[in-house]
């Protein structure tokens, strides 16, 4: 039986949407200054973010860029077996701050997808918290 998931993590930052988008767009490249775990690298294919072409790999996730709208969102489609859905970063205004939300919306197959999410769920939560903490430090520089 397929299992739907909808998981979000968010935080508001003092940085501009332009700067925060730039930091997110550079993740997995030589310009990445916010991925928190050097021993568990975040990698993406080289070049500009191009839907249908740019790929990413991290924490057991393999995804292809589905949509990019500068200063608004970067959305990836899972390529992992048993997972049908997306995860991405969404930027919005929160009074004088910029809110960043990472949202995962997917349907998991009963076997592969459920096992994949079980392995990923805890590290995903820690990664989001650490990423947001590092982004906050970088934006204060």
Task: Identify what each model region corresponds to.
Residues 6-8, 58-62, 83-88:
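Short, surface-exposed coil-to-beta transition loops
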Residues 14-18, 66-71, 90-99, 137-140:
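A short, structured loop/turn motif at beta-sheet edges
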Residues 37-44, 132-141:
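Short, highly charged C-terminal tails/helix-capping segments
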Residues 50-58, 74-80:
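Short beta-strand segments that buttress and anchor functional surface loops
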């Amino acid at each position: 039986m397929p299992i739907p998931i909808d998981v979000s993590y968010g935080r508001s930052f003092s940085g501009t949407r332009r700067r925060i988008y730039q930091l997110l767009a550079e993740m997995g490249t030589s310009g990445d200054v916010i991925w928190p775990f050097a021993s568990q690298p975040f990698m993406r294919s080289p070049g500009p973010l191009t839907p249908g072409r740019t790929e990413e790999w991290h924490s057991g996730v393999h995804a292809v860029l589905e949509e990019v709208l500068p200063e608004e969102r970067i959305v990836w489609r899972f390529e992992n077996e048993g997972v049908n859905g997306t995860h991405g970063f969404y930027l919005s205004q929160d009074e004088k701050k910029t809110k960043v939300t990472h949202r995962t919306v997917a349907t998991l197959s009963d076997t592969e997808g459920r096992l994949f999410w079980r392995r990923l769920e805890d590290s995903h939560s820690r990664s989001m918290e650490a990423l947001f903490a590092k982004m906050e430090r970088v934006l204060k520089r």
